[in-house]
Amino acid sequence: SYDSFGDRVTIIVFGASGDLARKKTFPALFGLFREKQLPSTVQIIGYARSHLSDKDFKDYISSHFKGGDDKTKEDFLNLCSYISDPYDTDEGYKKLEARCQEYESKHNVKVPERLFYLALPPSVFHTVCEQVKKNVYPKNEKSRIIIEKPFGRDLETYRELQKQISPLFTEDEVYRIDHYLGKEMVKNLLVLRFGNELFSGIWNNKHITSVQISFKEAFGTEGRGGYFDNIGIIRDVMQNHLLQVLTLLTMERPVSFDPEAVRDEKVKVLKAFDKIDVNDVLLGQYGKSEDGTKPGYLDDSTVKPNSKAVTYAAFRVNIHNERWDGVPIVLRAGKALDEGKAEIRIQFKPVAKGMFKEIQRNELVIRIQPNEAIYLKINSKIPGISTETSLTDLDLTYSTRYSKDFWIPEAYEALIRDCYLGNHSNFVRDDELEVSWKLFTPLLEAVEKEENVKLESYPYGSKGPKELRKYLIDHGYVFNDPGTYQWPLTNTDVK
């Protein structure tokens, strides 16, 4: 059971005039309200430096709302108000406290409940946290604070950030958001693994020969290169999103779904990870598309000339424990590729030849986005007079299996709801970040010493660096023979 908030809560969004708040935070709050997962009695206050009237603020945040009729939108916006003031002076926070107290006294709230959402860059985290604690955080209340990534740039900056925040708030009050943990298929991983004996019994190095977690974006930096140039793909999605997926995929069974039990097991498996071999990493940067219509990374005017920023990376992770020792695990991610997709591929050992001269390997594919799906590639006899086998699949595609009446929350909707309920399961704990930065910092330092970096160029809209296929084969992945597997419909020309 969780320590849930009640019906009279003040939700305060800092950075309310920013892109993140407009595109993610407020649409998520509206989505919860639309689905009656957020009480209609809460108060929502936006706080930012930008000078906006209440009307302009409401027009701004509602531009990305999905679904709901005009009445629902109007009812939600009636809960919202805006305060414009600097982040580093007391004045605005005193206005904020006055507005909170007015709401709480009007509704006779005995124990104030406040949720602070920091949709802000890390450079102002400390200032805002100090001001909140000083001016808007009475001792007798129940409060929670949501912090957005990045949680530092490396181990040193993470520790510095933690040193600033930990004296102000307890770990129980802090909710570090990695939106990948709110994705439906990621939340399904523990049930899939531990709720099915079929998988539970074979989820180990006796049966699995290869694991891949891949993240593909079909677009480049498109004018946002100035931000990406300082981050790179490893810091942007691999140290956080893909690592979170990997820990859920490889952790041991927790004693329960209790948040601390789950997070304890994630930390345990992280501690079994071997150091990443910086000499066994495939790095790339996209160039112009083959037809010349899409610009290369260095053509982005916001990028440093001759930048060595990594837009594609693949590397192997080794886990030294009884379950995973010897299984090659490859994380790979890239921008400006042929499609946008995130998925997990788990390949199993081959069956003994004997009866079969040639037979393909079983493979479990878990598609996180888009269009959530789980399918298991299996061998089956080709229908008709043939005695040949071909690969087919057992397929669970959410859109065809579950009726459209199912509300599948967006990642931010799911996570804000979890925070409201007091459920920490899908948020990142301090010691988890400490271990993950210890793992990734040496890799990042090696990659960012530019003289060491060998970047493979790949065309915008391609599958990635041409060396990728060989890299995957070298790390245990066996590709299907050409023509043996056809998706989604198998034709008579199957080999």
Curated annotation (Swiss-Prot):
One of its GO terms (biological process) is glucose metabolic process. NADP(+) 2 binds at R332, K341, R345, R367, Y375, L376, K377, D395, L396, T397, K463. It comes from the Eukaryota. GO terms for cellular component: cytosol. It catalyses: D-glucose 6-phosphate + NADP(+) = 6-phospho-D-glucono-1,5-lactone + NADPH + H(+). GO terms for molecular function: glucose-6-phosphate dehydrogenase activity; NADP binding. InterPro entries: G6P_DH, G6P_DH_AS, G6P_DH_C, G6P_DH_NAD-bd, NAD(P)-bd_dom_sf. The active site is at H241 (proton acceptor). It is an enzyme of class 1 (oxidoreductase). Keywords: Acetylation, Carbohydrate metabolism, Glucose metabolism, NADP, Oxidoreductase. The modification N-acetylserine is found at S1. Pathway: Carbohydrate degradation; pentose phosphate pathway; D-ribulose 5-phosphate from D-glucose 6-phosphate (oxidative stage): step 1/3. NADP(+) 1 binds at G15, A16, S17, G18, D19, L20, A21, R22, R49, K149. The keyword RNA-binding does not apply. SUPFAM superfamilies: Glyceraldehyde-3-phosphate dehydrogenase-like, C-terminal domain, NAD(P)-binding Rossmann-fold domains. Transmembrane segments: none annotated. Its EC number is 1.1.1.49. Belongs to the glucose-6-phosphate dehydrogenase family. This is Glucose-6-phosphate 1-dehydrogenase. The lineage of its organism: Eukaryota, Fungi, Dikarya, Ascomycota, Saccharomycotina.
